[in-house]
């Protein structure tokens, strides 16, 4: 079993960071969220001069047994087909990774297909998709622990490559369903408010999806612990992302959080280790029903609101230039004393 030892960032540098930020050549607070990010990143890295190095987008992919209950508009083969598209550079996440200088890492967490691992997909498969959680647990506790361990190892790999800032993405037809159930059970928000259109369900489809998820929750026979809820309803790619996030926090890396799926992954991660949220920057508020509610429940502020609902890490990557600006502010702006400017506030 993988044990994580995550600490909150040391607060000893807080006053020095605030002093540096307040003495840059600008009115106090005038760079808003950039100043908040600079403080957070400075505390994570324990420095007055933070850096961003070798950004990676780790994309975990897996299939979901709940799809057999008709909860998704898209057939499950889209999972492997899109993974092939990622491999060949033709997806939304690909152009954004190219544009913003991210290295894309593709991981098979449990896709129900024979994938071409020799072409660059990392084989971390735990199985050929989860079971339908309408009928019982999606995965065993042993499988959940294996996912956490393998996700952590992927983070170790990119950290060894010099990465100190990582976004996590996902591909898994049906994965808004486990996300909605996690959100409901881990926050107490009504299930109806947590269920949305996913990849494009109409109102009738959303109602059917809700009914399936409601039956699944009603039939839940676990112990109610966070780990049990994660395993009973989760997806392999989602739990692997949790492992990746927890290890990233343990290594004091910056975690860029993407959309509805990944927000619920870090919600789940925070139920295991609350400290992980100190390392998280929330990239955007997506268009999926429930995303704003779960962000509000976690009391976090996303950087962007662009109506995105693609996943893959795309929203987190779109927000990255704002993170870069916050670091550049700390390293490139002059202070009042050095610039011989009277402090005017």
Swiss-Prot record:
Catalytic activity: 5,6-dimethylbenzimidazole + nicotinate beta-D-ribonucleotide = alpha-ribazole 5'-phosphate + nicotinate + H(+)
GO molecular function: nicotinate-nucleotide-dimethylbenzimidazole phosphoribosyltransferase activity
Pfam families, per the entry: DBI_PRT (PF02277)
UniProt keyword Ion transport present: no
Entry keyword annotation includes Glycosyltransferase: yes
SUPFAM superfamilies referenced in this protein's UniProt entry, alphabetically: Nicotinate mononucleotide:5,6-dimethylbenzimidazole phosphoribosyltransferase (CobT) (SSF52733)
InterPro entries referenced in this protein's UniProt entry, alphabetically: Nict_dMeBzImd_PRibTrfase (IPR003200), Nict_dMeBzImd_PRibTrfase_bact (IPR017846), Nict_dMeBzImd_PRibTrfase_N (IPR023195), Nict_dMeBzImd_PRibTrfase_sf (IPR036087)
Broad EC category: transferase
Keyword annotations: Cobalamin biosynthesis, Glycosyltransferase, Transferase
Gene Ontology biological process terms, A to Z: cobalamin biosynthetic process
Biological role stated in the UniProt entry: Catalyzes the synthesis of alpha-ribazole-5'-phosphate from nicotinate mononucleotide (NAMN) and 5,6-dimethylbenzimidazole (DMB).
NCBIfam families assigned to the protein according to its UniProt record, in alphabetical order: cobT_DBIPRT (TIGR03160), PRK00105.1 (NF000996)
Protein family membership: Belongs to the CobT family.
PANTHER family, A to Z: NICOTINATE-NUCLEOTIDE--DIMETHYLBENZIMIDAZOLE PHOSPHORIBOSYLTRANSFERASE
Name recorded for this polypeptide: Nicotinate-nucleotide--dimethylbenzimidazole phosphoribosyltransferase
Gene: cobT
